[in-house]
Amino acid sequence: MIMEFEFSKMLEEVLTWIVAHLDGPLWDATIIILLGTGLFFTITTGFVQFRLFPASLREMWFGRSVEGSSLTPFQAFTTGLASRVGVGNIGGVATAIALGGEGAVFWMWVTAFIGMSSAFAESTLAQLFKIQDKDGSFRGGPAYYIVQGLKSRCMAVAFALALIFTFGFAFNSVQANSIVEATSNAWNWKGEYVGISLVIFTALIIFGGVKRIAIISSNLVPMMALFYLIMAVIILGMHIDMIPSVIHRIVQSAFSFDAAAGGMFGALVSKAMMMGIKRGLFSNEAGMGSAPNSAAAAHVKHPVSQGLVQMLGVFVDTMIVCTCTAVIILLSNNYGSETLKSISLTQNALQYHIGEFGAHFLAFILLLFAYSSIIGNYAYAESNIRFIKNKPWLVLLFRLMVLFFVYFGAVRSGNVVWNFADTVMAVMAIINLIAILMLSPIVWKLMKDYQRQLKEGKTPEFKIDEYPELRKKIFDSRIWK
């Protein structure tokens, strides 16, 4: 038997203490800022998630090829989707329902709908403020638009560190933990062996470079999503007459009050709302500041183009994939069991609908989902490591720490890694949401430029020389010549 590292046990105790003291106050602030920012951009952009939804489909589909070494819009979309479409759609939804009840699904919908406008804003800004490397590829994200747009290196570094801890360490621990739970339930695989295997296969990928990561994600994500959705549609079709009652239960339960624990607002909001918002943010990442890192890597003619593409990713993640998972769970007779939470709840629901095959099928699909999420998470975090200090030794150290946290998640308690993820993602989201609020005038300016060109019958193309006030802020304005 492979022994667990003593350090991982000590780390679990430290993380438990940190979460106990910080999670409540952090989520008080996060709920207010997350929903407030989403509503602000929804209103000030004239409900961009409705008006420009058809344009987002065009931008994604017709951006499948580009010359040079930068990512295509489609690859940037699927890299973002690799992180969005994963454990959050399967284990996250199940956890939300287990802890927050049926109504948590409604609040996941609300978070996604409002968050689509925040996702649009953050990814548009990431495109504008991106920089170009020597090999011709692009990189960027919140740290880049904070330091250029707000001229705050300290705030940018704080965000970069928060993202590194969230995606490089915490979220990858969650992904590994979920793989272990799924494979243990289906095939009785031991966590230690699964953890070591994940470390090996992750190492093979993360030393291959971001371009390679994008290619793998581009190939895997559509296939994974398609398989999972086909299975979901088959199950929903088998119970089509029961779906209206399930939707009614979701909406009705959303407004029943059962106070959530922790923080000032823990006594003012329901468990359904708290868990729906937490798991909704974990799943779709709208406004968190993660997707802009892949959005910045895309080669597009106008910043708004990639903002629309990433907005579409939020819709696909929550309104389609998460909803399918939720309905599958709520249609099963085993919903509400005290012993079934997270991945095991979803596996049990599938087993109820389609037999033993369901548990095995989900374990295989989740293995692919979670592994691709680890790849996408790493890509986000590496970009921010290079922002802080682009030194080979630091990148190497970071990669080794990523591998450690993958193993840590595989062998430690699910409650510990999920709570750790909740806490650090709240810090990351707060910093990013404040930044995009402060940069909102730039978002409006770019959107007006895009819409003006559409009305003139042109393919929108951003010319930085027409906006000298923006050219002065951007480090690499040659990109938009």
UniProtKB/Swiss-Prot annotation:
Membrane spanning stretches: 30-50, 96-116, 154-174, 196-216, 220-240, 250-270, 311-331, 354-374, 391-411, 424-444
- Output a single Gene Ontology CC term carried by this record: plasma membrane
PANTHER family, per this entry? AGSS FAMILY TRANSPORTER, SODIUM-ALANINE (PTHR30330), AMINO-ACID CARRIER PROTEIN ALST (PTHR30330:SF1)
Q: Which family does it belong to?
A: Belongs to the alanine or glycine:cation symporter (AGCS) (TC 2.A.25) family.
Q: Which UniProt keywords apply?
A: Cell inner membrane, Cell membrane, Membrane, Symport, Transmembrane, Transmembrane helix, Transport
User: In which domain of life is the source organism classified?
Assistant: Bacteria
Cross-referenced Pfam families: Na_Ala_symp
Q: What InterPro entries does UniProt report for this protein, alphabetically? A: Na/Ala_symport (IPR001463)
Q: Which GO terms describe its molecular function?
A: amino acid:sodium symporter activity
Q: Give the membrane topology, semicolon-separated if more than one.
A: Multi-pass membrane protein
Keyword Cell inner membrane assigned to the entry: answer is: yes
* Localization annotation: Cell inner membrane
The name this protein goes by in its record: Uncharacterized transporter HI_0183
| Main localization of the protein described in the UniProt heading | membrane
Q: Specify the species.
A: Haemophilus influenzae (strain ATCC 51907 / DSM 11121 / KW20 / Rd)
- For whether the record's keyword set contains Transmembrane helix, the answer is yes
